[in-house]
């Protein structure tokens, strides 16, 4: 693998809470650059204008900084190849799109969303994978000009070779061959003029002189589109490396439904960043048992990108807890430990919000742990007996928990008002009084039938923690139902 003049990047999309999977890919790129004396840069890929927000961008940057990752160039510090935010680069992409049209490598497509959906439904009914059928390929230049002048909306799609295969070597998967007839005529420029991921990704990587592209294995099937774009533009392509996805213990894809996936979840609960990076870094190295405790420099020394496994990296929270405990006990001096605790407490938004709610509800400071301690716990240790005191039967409690969990995911802005509104709506849909619905939620969220106000507590804890606690509560109640 060629490694001279290495430049790698992490390119997160600011469409939600920063994911541990982003930290996983970022760490690989960071270690790769560090190992080869190269440069690690950060680019924000916000071409999804409907879901990308400045707030999520800030959270992503803050989360990666908390992880201890430092980039040489990025939207927050600038650099010679900026802007480093794709929405700020929109004018850059248009000439390249026109170049593809002029060279006959792309075409305008006027198919409506309704027509495309009908096409996909017909393909699925015939047992075929959905992909564009090429209807607009036959349009003449005059027809395209006329329809465009009439104000008809269009996108720009790339042309795909009609036969043969795309053969390439991946840094992890080795030699790969993908038939061209399985590759879709990808949209490159959307109707609003914004590029899709595929178009912007290739252009930005070239202009930013990226030499190695390391990303999740879910992008492996997209490599033919990217290689084709490099060929169409006459550019040298980077080395591709597709990393195995992180998985749950049952080998399923890591998801927020089974494990907390937000970096902020681990930060707020008192995990230390060195331990999280240590844990993620173990997926990229080979060590003997007993050698697991490693600093970033030690991870870099042992890092070997030529011996990566295609097997899924198992995200074992128990192992993370074990490593975090070892870091606290073995790597931090007493003074540093105290400083970390104080800094964590002072910067902990949950604690601050909990103190504000608690001030009017206590008569002694010593009452705080019982009243608000649940805000800082990683595990409430819920037992089936904790729900036995609720008047509703276990079957009804389980129904409530199983209904509330997915419905809360519909909330776009997670705050007191939206949580209350959704829970009231759930109560109406279930035909139950609000008190009946929220009673088990008090126990699920705080571990007690009486605590700080429920809606405030849920807002303070955040979506990831509430999701996890409701899941564990449902498991506890299911055991109660099974015992009857």
UniProtKB/Swiss-Prot annotation:
Residues that coordinate or bind ATP: 256
Domain of life: Bacteria
Molecular functions per Gene Ontology: ATP binding; glutamate-tRNA ligase activity; tRNA binding; zinc ion binding
Motif ('HIGH' region): 12-22
Catalyses which reaction(s): tRNA(Glu) + L-glutamate + ATP = L-glutamyl-tRNA(Glu) + AMP + diphosphate
GO biological process entries: glutamyl-tRNA aminoacylation
Pfam families: Anticodon_2 (PF19269), tRNA-synt_1c (PF00749)
GO CC annotations, alphabetized: cytosol
Chain span(s) of sequence motif 'KMSKS' region: 253-257
Main enzyme class: ligase
Listed EC numbers: 6.1.1.17
Localization annotation: Cytoplasm
Main location: cytoplasm
InterPro entries: aa-tRNA-synth_I_cd-bd (IPR045462), aa-tRNA-synth_I_codon-bd_sub2 (IPR020751), aa-tRNA-synth_I_CS (IPR001412), aa_tRNA-synth_I_cd-bd_sf (IPR008925), Glu-tRNA-ligase_bac/mito (IPR004527), Glu/Gln-tRNA-synth (IPR000924), Glu/Gln-tRNA-synth_Ib_cat-dom (IPR020058), GluQ/Sye (IPR049940)
Record Gene3D superfamilies: 1.10.10.350, HUPs
Keyword list, A-Z: Aminoacyl-tRNA synthetase, ATP-binding, Cytoplasm, Ligase, Nucleotide-binding, Protein biosynthesis
Oligomeric form and interacting partners: Monomer.
Stated family: Belongs to the class-I aminoacyl-tRNA synthetase family. Glutamate--tRNA ligase type 1 subfamily.
Purpose of the protein: Catalyzes the attachment of glutamate to tRNA(Glu) in a two-step reaction: glutamate is first activated by ATP to form Glu-AMP and then transferred to the acceptor end of tRNA(Glu).
Protein name: Glutamate--tRNA ligase
Organism: Rhizobium etli (strain CIAT 652)
